[in-house]
Amino acid sequence: MTRHKPKVLFLSTGTAARSLIAEGFLRSLTGDRFDVVSVGVERSASNPMASEVMKEAGIDISGQKTMSVAQSLKEPFGHVITICDTDKERSPIFPFALGVLHWNVVDPNATGGLGNQKKEVYRRVRDEIQQKVRQFVADSAQVKASELSIA
């Protein structure tokens, strides 16, 4: 029996900076265990600040590409993780996914500040997303272990 990798979509409201950070951490922590896709509601070029703070964490996301929202709606995903600031942004609804999680994370592009202040915001966002990705991986491992114990 062929096992397919679970497909995970990280969907950021705003630009894809947060979803690219989440994708980078998931790939770093799990290798190719998941098929991972990033989407930002607002199309944007690569985000140098996100790449820079991820490089500080030892992860290169500069080569990651985002999928368009329209294309993501055509794909089946086992997990959809929306990343938005629930105080300022509406969490997208994704009705056709098996598992949907909503992560409340501020949009680093929507905060004030320049230079080092902005970089500090990106670092806090990076660290928060890292914790959430680690929890997702741990929860996924527990689900997989419980499936194996049933068999």
Label the predicted regions.
Residues 1-71:
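Conserved active-site segments centered on acidic
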Residues 74-76:
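Alpha-helix C-terminal capping/helix-to-coil transition sites in glycosyltransferase folds
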Residues 88-151:
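Phosphate-binding/catalytic loops
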Residues 40, 84, 104-106:
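Residues at the C-termini of beta-strands that transition into short coil/loop
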Residues 14-16, 85-88:
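Short glycine-rich anion-binding loops that position phosphate/pyrophosphate groups of nucleotides
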